[in-house]
């Protein structure tokens, strides 16, 4: 089993040995065993609190292999609002519930949840379920180990 111990900045030109598709929740696991899509077992042994992002590169402990992290598509709810204020209100209510949210100027996205979906519909947002890569905000106290 290969053990990956170092985080490198995203580099589209890097020659990687493997890719590892992980959900948003899996990208928060800094010490965990995973299996690549082609069945290779890898172990991440990164500093505690490391959160991985789409495109990150990890270096194996013997410096012989690189692996690229890919944001794995997962079931999410995407919410759109007619006005910026309505989108802001929705973000407030989701934040009040400590829900991991991907925030953009035009939509909010979170892991599929029927109760939260109904709440946003009651507020007047248009919501739809999709299978897409999910990249939530880390929060005010989230650790960020390198620039993107």
Curated annotation (Swiss-Prot):
Leader sequence residues: none
Keywords for this protein: Chaperone, Cytoplasm, Nickel
GO cellular component, one term: cytoplasm
Molecular-function GO terms, alphabetical: nickel cation binding; unfolded protein binding
Compartments where located: Cytoplasm
tRNA-binding is among the record's keywords: no
GO term, biological process aspect, one: protein folding
Major place of residence: cytoplasm
Family statement: Belongs to the UreE family.
Function: Involved in urease metallocenter assembly. Binds nickel. Probably functions as a nickel donor during metallocenter assembly.
Protein name in UniProt: Urease accessory protein UreE
Species name: Nostoc punctiforme (strain ATCC 29133 / PCC 73102)
Recorded name of the encoding gene: ureE
């Amino acid at each position: 089993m290969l053990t990956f111990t170092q985080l490198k900045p995203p580099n589209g030109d890097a020659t990687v040995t493997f890719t590892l598709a992980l959900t948003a929740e899996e990208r928060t696991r800094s010490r965990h065993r995973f299996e690549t899509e082609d069945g290779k077992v890898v172990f991440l042994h990164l500093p505690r609190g490391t959160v991985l992002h789409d495109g990150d590169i990890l270096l194996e402990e013997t410096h012989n292999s690189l692996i690229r992290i890919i944001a794995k598509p997962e079931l999410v709810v995407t919410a759109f609002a007619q006005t910026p204020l309505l989108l802001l209100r929705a973000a407030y209510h989701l934040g009040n519930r400590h829900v991991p949210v991907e925030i953009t100027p035009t939509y909010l996205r979170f892991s599929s949840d029927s109760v939260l979906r109904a709440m946003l519909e009651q507020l007047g947002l248009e919501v739809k379920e999709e299978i897409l890569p999910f990249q939530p905000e880390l929060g005010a106290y989230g650790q960020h180990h390198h620039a993107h």
